[in-house]
Curated annotation (Swiss-Prot):
This is DNA mismatch repair protein MutS. Keywords: ATP-binding, DNA damage, DNA repair, DNA-binding, Nucleotide-binding. ATP binds at residues 607-614. HAMAP family: MutS.
Length: 860
C-alpha cells in the first residue's frame, strides 16, 4: 500500500465514510479537496487544479476554496445535485501536538440546505423517504428542513403514484434502501432528476418518538424513521424545530398527475421552465415568503371538501369587501419576515443578531394584523385573527436585549444594548473612557511636540501606537518614545503611559466581546422555547397572506365567486383563460361559455389549427382549479362541480418520457385517464390519434370517446381534426359538437376564437400553412390535392352496434410498397403470444413503458 503522509491518511480515512460527497477538508483558511474530488470539483467550480506532496512520487491532485467564501461554491455543487461533507478542525492547532483532529460536522445535500442563499424564498426544499412494505404499499414521508415541516402518507406501490407525489412536492432528494433503489426503474430515476441517497436504518430515534402518532401504519413509521435517522446522522445537530408528523391522504385533494400539471402550466411553464406565464405566477400577490410557499402548496393540491372551499371563498369575499383595510393588511404583511425559516435557523444555532431583529420587527406587526382583521367585523376573519399569537414576552425580550443596527458577526460585539447587563456596561465604560483618554493623549502629544500630523492609531497586530512622519521624527524628545514599527514614510512609537492604558482598554474590550457573545447565546436559547409557537404563527400569517392575494387578484382581474353545483353540472358564462388574458390584455381576449351536465358529458371540439381549441380546454380546467383552491374565477357567471381528478393530453408533451414516440405518450396518457377517471373527473383530450396513420387514429379516437361515454361518464372535452367523428353526436346521447368559428375574408382566414354549437365546416389547414409562409407553389399544389380528395371522399362512421353505415371502397394507401406477408418465425410467435397474454388494463403507464423496453430488447 502507498505510504501517504499522516495528513493524507487522515483525509482518506474520512473520505472513505463519505464516498458519495465532495469532502471539504479544512486546512487553515481553506477547504481543500484531493484525488478524484479535486479533479471533478476543479471542472465543475472552474477553479485551479494544483498538486500537493503526499508521500507518493507524483503530486496528489488538489484544489481548494477560501473558507470565508466557501458557501458560494457549496451552493453551486448542491444546485447541480451533488453532496458536500464539511470537515472541520475540532482541536485548536495552537494547543495540539501532532496531527489536528478533524471530523465531518455536517453533510449538505440538495434536500438539507439551510443557508438562506441556497434556498428560493417562495419554494419549499423537500427531502423525502420511502419504505416499501411487502411490495404492496409505500410508506412515504417528507420534510422541509428549513421550515420544520414533516408529513407522511401511505400510497400504492406503483411508480406512477410515487412520481406524482415526488413531482407534486418538487422533491430535491429521496432516501431509499439499496434494495428499494434497485427496484426503481432507470427511466424513473432519469425522469425525476433528483438526488438519491441510500440509507438502511429506519427506526425512529428515541429523541424524535414524540413526532410520530400512535395511529400511523408500520410502513409510514418506517419511512419517517428512515428520514429522521438520515437527518440526525448527516446534520449532527439539534433538530428540535421539526414539527410533529402530520398524516395526509392524497384522496382528500384533487388528483392531477405530473403530465396534467405540466400541460396546464400550474407552477412551471413548459417552455421557460419558470413561473412566468403559469397559474401560480398569476395568483401570487403574497407579501411574505412563507405565504408564497403555502400558495404553491394550495395550487398543487386543490381541495375537494365543499366546506373547506366555501370557507376560503367566504374569507376572500370579506377581504374584497374591505378595500382600505386590505391595503393596510398588505402593508403590515410586507414587514413580516420568513418566520418559518427564522425558527429553523434558531434551532440550528446559526441565527445571527440581524435575524433576531427581523424576528422582533415581524412580531411588531402581529397585533396590527390582528386589529385590522377584527376591524372588518367578519366572523370568518375574526376566527383567523384569534389564531395570531403575538408572543409578547419574546418581543419584549428582543427589544430589551438587541440593538437596532446589529452587525452580522456575533463574536465582535456591538449586539447587546446598553443597560441590559451591568457587568457589560462596566466593561464598556472602561473601554470608552480609555478611548476618550486616547483621543486626549493625541491632542496633548501634538501640543508637546509641535507635530500637527501626529496621530494615535490601532491595529490588531501591534495594538495602539503613535505615528509620526519620517520628516518630523527629529522633533520627538529623546528617551520617551519607543520605536514599535517602521513604515516607508513614517515611524510608529509607543510610550509607557500608552502601553499601560492599552492593556486596560484591550482587556475590557476582550471581556466585553466574550460577555456579549454569552448574552447573545442566552437570548438565542430563549428564542428556541418559542419555536413551536412561531411555527403556528407562521402558518396563520401564511394563510392570511394567501387569502389576501386571492382577493387582490380577483378584484384586479374581475373574477367572480363561483357557485358549487350539487348535481355535477358545469355552467360557465363568458369564461376566460386567466393567464392568457393577463398576457394579452382583457380587451383582446375573447370569452366563451361552457356547459356540461348529465345529458351533455362530452364536448367534441372541431375547428382550425391556431383557433384556440387547446386554450379553451385549458381554460375550463384552470377555472375549476381556481375554484377548488378557494379563489374566485375568470367569468361573468360560474357554477362548477367539485372535480376529484383532472386528466389532460394537450400537445407539447412529446418530450415528457425519454425515448417515447408521440403516439406512445398519447396512448399511455389516454389509458391513465380512462382507467382512473370517475364520473366526478374532468378529462381533456387534444387531438388523440394524431401520432399514427389516419384511419388508425380515427378508429382509436372514436373508440376512446365511446368508452368514456358508456363506462366512465367523466366530463370530457375532446378536440379533433377527424371531422368524421362529428357524426357521433347522432349515436351518443351525451355527446355534443361545438366548434371554434372562423371566417374567410378576401381569401384569407380570420380566426374569431369564439365557441359555437355544432361541428366546424372546414379545417382551414391550408390557410394556416399559408400564414406560416410556405412557398406559394406548395400551397397551390396542396389546394388542388385537397379538391381531389374531397371529391372522392366518403364518410366512415361505425355505429355502436358495430354495423358500418358506409364504408369506403378503398383501403388507406401505404406510402411504401407492401411486401407479401411471410410466416412468422418462432421468435416472433413467442413475442406475439407474450403480447397477447399481457393485461394492458391492469398496467400503469410506467409498467407499460418498462414492458415495451423489455420486448424491444428481445427483438434486438
Amino acid at each position: 500500500m502507498t505510504e501517504y503522509t499522516p495528513m493524507i491518511k487522515q483525509y482518506l480515512e474520512i473520505k472513505d465514510k463519505y464516498q458519495d460527497a465532495f469532502l471539504f477538508f479544512r486546512l487553515g483558511d481553506f477547504y481543500e479537496m484531493f484525488f478524484e474530488d479535486a479533479l471533478n470539483a476543479s471542472q465543475i467550480l472552474e477553479i485551479t487544479l494544483t498538486g500537493r506532496e503526499g508521500g507518493t512520487k507524483e503530486k496528489i491532485p488538489m484544489c481548494g476554496v477560501p473558507y470565508h467564501s466557501a458557501s458560494g461554491y457549496i451552493d453551486t455543487l448542491i444546485e447541480k445535485g451533488y453532496k458536500v461533507a464539511i470537515c472541520e478542525q475540532v482541536e485548536d492547532p495552537k494547543t495540539t501536538k501532532g496531527m489536528v483532529k478533524r471530523e465531518v460536522v455536517q453533510l449538505i445535500s440538495p434536500g438539507t440546505v439551510m443557508d438562506e442563499r441556497g434556498l428560493k424564498a417562495k419554494e419549499n426544499n423537500y427531502i423525502a423517504s420511502l419504505y416499501c412494505y411487502e411490495g404492496k404499499e409505500y410508506g412515504f414521508a417528507y420534510s422541509d428542513l428549513s421550515t420544520g415541516e414533516l408529513k407522511s402518507t401511505v400510497i400504492e406501490a406503483s411508480e406512477d403514484r410515487l412520481i406524482n407525489e415526488l413531482t407534486t412536492l418538487s422533491t430535491r432528494e429521496l432516501i431509499v434502501s439499496e434494495s428499494e433503489k434497485e427496484v426503481l426503474s432507470d427511466v424513473m430515476k432519469e425522469q425525476l432528476g433528483l438526488t438519491f441517497s441510500v440509507h438502511e436504518e429506519d427506526t425512529i430515534p428515541a429523541e424524535n418518538e414524540k413526532l410520530v402518532t400512535r395511529h400511523m401504519s408500520l410502513s409510514e413509521k418506517r419511512a419517517i424513521g428512515k428520514l429522521l435517522h438520515y437527518l440526525k446522522e448527516t446534520q449532527k445537530r439539534d433538530l428540535g424545530h421539526l414539527q410533529q408528523a402530520i398524516h395526509y391522504e392524497t384522496s382528500n385533494y384533487m388528483k392531477m398527475d405530473y403530465y396534467s400539471k405540466r400541460n396546464l402550466e400550474l407552477a412551471e411553464s413548459i417552455r421557460g421552465k419558470g413561473r412566468q406565464g403559469t397559474l401560480l405566477w398569476l395568483l401570487d400577490n403574497t407579501q411574505t415568503a412563507m405565504g408564497g410557499r403555502m400558495l404553491k402548496q394550495w395550487i398543487d393540491r386543490p381541495l375537494i371538501d365543499r366546506k373547506q372551499i366555501i370557507e376560503r371563498q367566504d374569507d376572500v369575499s370579506e377581504l374584497m369587501a374591505h378595500f382600505f383595510e386590505r391595503l393596510e393588511l398588505v402593508e403590515n404583511l410586507k414587514n413580516v419576515y420568513d418566520l418559518e425559516r427564522l425558527a429553523g435557523r434558531v434551532a440550528y444555532g446559526n441565527v445571527n443578531a440581524r435575524d433576531l431583529i427581523q424576528l422582533r420587527n415581524s412580531l411588531y406587526q402581529i397585533p396590527r394584523i390582528r386589529a385590522t382583521l377584527l376591524s372588518m367585523n367578519s366572523k370568518s376573519l375574526t376566527a383567523l385573527a384569534n389564531q395570531l399569537d403575538p408572543c409578547e414576552e419574546l418581543t419584549e425580550k428582543l427589544e430589551e436585549a438587541i440593538v437596532d443596527s446589529a452587525p452580522i458577526s456575533i463574536r465582535e460585539g456591538g449586539i447587546i444594548k446598553d443597560g441590559y447587563n451591568s457587568q457589560l456596561d462596566t466593561y464598556r465604560d472602561a473601554s470608552r473612557n480609555g478611548k476618550t483618554w486616547i483621543a486626549e493623549l493625541e491632542r496633548k502629544e501634538r501640543e508637546l511636540t509641535g507635530i500637527k500630523t501626529m496621530k494615535v492609531g490601532f491595529n490588531r497586530v501591534f495594538g495602539y501606537y503613535i505615528e509620526v512622519t519620517r520628516a518630523n521624527t527629529h522633533l520627538l524628545p529623546e528617551g520617551r518614545y519607543e520605536r514599535k514599527q517602521t513604515l516607508a514614510n513614517a515611524e510608529r512609537y509607543i510610550t509607557p503611559e500608552l502601553k499601560e492604558k492599552e492593556k486596560l482598554i484591550l482587556d475590557a474590550e476582550e471581556k466585553s466581546m466574550e460577555l456579549e457573545y454569552q448574552l447573545f447565546t442566552e437570548v438565542r436559547e430563549m428564542v428556541k422555547d418559542y419555536i413551536e409557537r412561531l411555527q403556528k404563527l407562521a402558518k396563520s400569517v401564511s394563510e392570511i397572506d394567501c387569502l389576501q392575494s386571492f382577493a387582490d387578484i380577483s378584484e384586479k382581474n374581475h373574477f367572480i365567486r363561483p357557485t358549487l353545483s350539487e348535481d355535477g353540472s358545469l355552467h360557465v358564462k363568458q369564461g376566460r383563460h386567466p393567464v392568457v388574458e393577463k398576457v394579452m390584455g382583457a380587451q383582446s381576449y375573447v370569452a366563451n361559455d361552457c356547459d356540461l351536465d348529465q345529458n351533455r358529458e362530452i364536448l367534441l371540439i372541431t375547428g382550425p389549427n391556431m383557433s384556440g381549441k387547446s386554450t379553451y380546454m385549458r381554460q375550463v380546467a384552470l377555472t375549476a382549479i381556481c375554484a377548488q383552491v378557494g379563489c374566485f374565477v375568470p367569468a361573468e357567471e360560474a357554477t362548477l362541480p367539485i372535480f376529484d381528478q383532472i386528466f389532460t393530453r394537450i400537445g407539447a408533451a412529446d418530450d415528457l418520457i425519454a425515448g417515447q414516440s408521440t403516439f406512445m405518450v398519447e396512448m399511455l396518457e389516454a389509458r391513465n385517464a380512462i382507467v382512473h377517471a370517475t364520473k366526478d373527473s374532468l378529462i381533456l383530450f387534444d387531438e388523440i390519434g394524431r401520432g399514427t396513420a389516419t384511419y388508425d387514429g380515427m378508429a382509436l379516437a372514436q373508440a376512446i370517446i365511446e368508452y368514456i361515454h358508456e363506462n366512465v361518464h367523466a366530463k370530457t372535452l375532446f378536440s379533433t381534426h377527424y371531422h368524421e367523428l362529428t357524426d357521433l353526436e347522432k349515436e351518443l346521447r351525451g355527446l355534443q359538437n361545438i366548434h371554434v368559428s372562423a371566417v374567410e375574408e378576401n381569401g384569407k382566414v380570420v380566426f374569431l376564437h369564439k365557441i359555437k354549437e355544432g361541428p366546424a365546416d372546414k379545417s382551414y389547414g391550408i390557410h394556416v400553412a399559408e400564414l406560416a409562409e410556405l412557398p406559394k407553389s406548395l400551397i397551390e399544389r396542396a389546394s388542388r390535392i385537397l379538391e381531389q380528395l374531397e371529391s372522392n371522399d366518403k364518410k366512415i362512421i361505425i355505429t355502436q352496434d358495430k354495423q358500418p353505415e358506409e364504408i369506403h371502397e378503398e383501403v388507406q394507401l401505404s406510402m411504401f410498397p407492401v411486401e407479401p406477408e411471410e410466416k412468422a418465425s418462432s421468435k416472433e410467435t413467442k413475442l406475439l403470444k407474450e403480447i397477447a397474454a399481457m393485461n394492458i388494463m391492469q398496467m400503469t403507464p410506467m409498467d407499460a413503458m418498462n414492458k415495451l423496453y423489455e420486448l424491444q430488447s428481445k427483438i434486438h
